[in-house]
Structures are given as structure tokens and as C-alpha cells.
């Protein structure tokens, strides 16, 4: 890897940890808060320096548009030939009716053309977030969560799951006897799901986030 200054290495490591933990990179404001910068502009300067050194790629106009480059053991990231010139057409899922598939036509309100560099892996759809249970993970009411369809997930990943008739976004942790779905907001309770529960179904994992107004 290109030699980085101590501060640049801190920023790079923070981005990498955020992607490993949540599936998407931090915002400039989150980097500034975590590393004690005076403002998000200071974080932006370090990001531009990292981009010039070829270790990250920045997507213009997106607060989480950061992608790691040239890191052999980095989390898998979506790459395409000429990715900057290509667009993904992603369906936006709004409210989901009980008992029907998330990607049923009646749940899709529209499609968005998105730059693939915004995401850590190729997503299958965008889910409009409702509520603040994941606030401390930087996921706010009205955000669009990029989701990759999966039937399995690792501990610590942010997932989309069905619980009975509801669809929820939580952090997954395995516990003796089942799974714990962890809220990233102390005002909300965690949810324990017993092993083999027929009410639980994993719908996918978070691979990116688009703040309302960024598209």
C-alpha cells in the first residue's frame, strides 16, 4: 500500500472498520466526530489526500460515497469495468404488505439510477427506512438503505429481516438458543428470536446508505 501519514492511516482504518461493521462507509461528519476534527471539511481534506494516493475512491455528491481500493483483505466491494460510467437501476421498496415478497411489484414505488461506487457490494434494492431504531449507526428515518438479498449473514452485520408481518432493520448477533436483533438506539429494545422460529426470515444485508435528498 502507498505510504500514509499517521493521520491518513487513522482515517483509512476508520473507513475500513465502518465498512466491516455496518456494510457502508462513514460520512464526513462521522469521521470528524470520531477523530476529533474541527469540522467535516477537515475530514474531506484527508479523504481527498487518500484519493490522490490511490487508496480510496470518492463519489461526488454523496456523503457516504467512499470506496476502498487495492486492499486484498478488505470487505468485498462492488466493482465493474468503467464503473464510473455505469448506473444501477434499483427499485425503491416502500411499505411491505404482510405475507408478500419484499420485491413484489406492489411494493415498488419507483426506480433510482445509482452510481455503483456508492455501495460496498452490488445491491438488489433500496428500502426506505422508517423510524429511528438504528440512529446511532447513522441510519435515519427517511434514508434509503441499499440491500443485497441474502439468506445468511455474519455477526455484526446490519440486516433486513421479517418478523411475522413486519420488516425491520437491525444489527445481527448470534446468541445461545437463537439470534438477537440489536437496535442502535437506547430508546428501542433489542429483539430475541428463538432458533428455528417460523416468524423470522432474513431478507438481506445492508451494503450502502443514501441520505434523503442525495439522489
Curated annotation (Swiss-Prot):
CDD domains: S24_LexA-like (cd06529). One of its GO terms (molecular function) is serine-type endopeptidase activity. Residues 28-48 bind DNA. Pfam families: LexA_DNA_bind, Peptidase_S24. The active site is at residues 133, 170. The record marks 98-99 as: Cleavage. It catalyses: Hydrolysis of Ala-|-Gly bond in repressor LexA. Keywords: Autocatalytic cleavage, DNA damage, DNA repair, DNA replication, DNA-binding, Hydrolase, Repressor, SOS response, Transcription, Transcription regulation. GO terms for biological process: DNA repair; DNA replication; negative regulation of DNA-templated transcription; proteolysis; SOS response. The keyword Signal does not apply. InterPro entries: LexA, LexA-like, LexA/Signal_pep-like_sf, LexA_DNA-bd_dom, LexA_repressor, Peptidase_S24_LexA, Peptidase_S24_S26A/B/C, WH-like_DNA-bd_sf. Coiled coil: none annotated. It comes from the Bacteria. Its EC number is 3.4.21.88. Gene3D superfamilies: Umud Fragment, subunit A, Winged helix-like DNA-binding domain superfamily/Winged helix DNA-binding domain. Belongs to the peptidase S24 family. Homodimer. HAMAP family: LexA. Represses a number of genes involved in the response to DNA damage (SOS response), including recA and lexA. In the presence of single-stranded DNA, RecA interacts with LexA causing an autocatalytic cleavage which disrupts the DNA-binding part of LexA, leading to derepression of the SOS regulon and eventually DNA repair. This is LexA repressor. It comes from Burkholderia cenocepacia (strain ATCC BAA-245 / DSM 16553 / LMG 16656 / NCTC 13227 / J2315 / CF5610) (Burkholderia cepacia (strain J2315)).
Amino acid at each position: 500500500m502507498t505510504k500514509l501519514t499517521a493521520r491518513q492511516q487513522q482515517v483509512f482504518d476508520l473507513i475500513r472498520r465502518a465498512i466491516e461493521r455496518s456494510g457502508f462507509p462513514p460520512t464526513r461528519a462521522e469521521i470528524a466526530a470520531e477523530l476529533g476534527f474541527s469540522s467535516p471539511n477537515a475530514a474531506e481534506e484527508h479523504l481527498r489526500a487518500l484519493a490522490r494516493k490511490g487508496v480510496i475512491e470518492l463519489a461526488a455528491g454523496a456523503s457516504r460515497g467512499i470506496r476502498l481500493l487495492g486492499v486484498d483483505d478488505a470487505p468485498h466491494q462492488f466493482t465493474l469495468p468503467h464503473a464510473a460510467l455505469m448506473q444501477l437501476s434499483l427499485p425503491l421498496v416502500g411499505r411491505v404488505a404482510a405475507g408478500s415478497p419484499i420485491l413484489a411489484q406492489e411494493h415498488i414505488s419507483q426506480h433510482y439510477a445509482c452510481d455503483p461506487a456508492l455501495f460496498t457490494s452490488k445491491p438488489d434494492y433500496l428500502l426506505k427506512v422508517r423510524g429511528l431504531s438504528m440512529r446511532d449507526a447513522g441510519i435515519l428515518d427517511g434514508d434509503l438503505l441499499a440491500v443485497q438479498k441474502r439468506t445468511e449473514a455474519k455477526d455484526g452485520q446490519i440486516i433486513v429481516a421479517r418478523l411475522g408481518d413486519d420488516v425491520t432493520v437491525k444489527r445481527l448477533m448470534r446468541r445461545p438458543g437463537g439470534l438477537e436483533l440489536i437496535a442502535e438506539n437506547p430508546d428501542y429494545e433489542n429483539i430475541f428470536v428463538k432458533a428455528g422460529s417460523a416468524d423470522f426470515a432474513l431478507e438481506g444485508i445492508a451494503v450502502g446508505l443514501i441520505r434523503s435528498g442525495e439522489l
